[in-house]
């Protein structure tokens, strides 16, 4: 299973209606090619800086960090969106985001 997981992409870049997105489990990074095996363990930067500034020219959509209130969170620049609403916890819920419309859906 570990071999299979290491073969998965770290992030996915896509463009919808002229807007560029990066999708990842916990944190996105610049779209340069990652060469280090260590990247899979540690990423490439400071998480707080990522939350504040994001990745230039992209909107990053991630999970992993449950925002306060179990709602989809956006940074002040609007280029980082955290969708983890704690659905694995008793007080959590599943948060979904429609990229085309920006609609937030909670289950």
Task: Give names to the regions the model predicted.
Residues 1-82, 86-92, 99-107:
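Acidic, His/Gly-enriched loop-helix segments that form or flank divalent-metal centers
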């Amino acid at each position: 299973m570990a071999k299979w997981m290491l073969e998965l992409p770290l992030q996915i870049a896509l463009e919808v209606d002229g807007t560029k997105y990066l999708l990842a489990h916990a944190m996105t990074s610049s779209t340069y090619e990652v060469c280090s095996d260590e990247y899979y363990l540690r990423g490439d930067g400071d998480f707080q800086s990522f939350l504040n500034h994001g990745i230039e020219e992209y909107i990053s959509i991630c999970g992993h960090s449950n925002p306060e209130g179990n709602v989809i969170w956006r940074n002040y620049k609007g280029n980082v969106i955290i969708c983890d609403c704690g659905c694995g916890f008793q007080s959590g819920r599943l948060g979904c985001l429609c990229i085309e419309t920006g609609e937030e859906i909670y289950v």
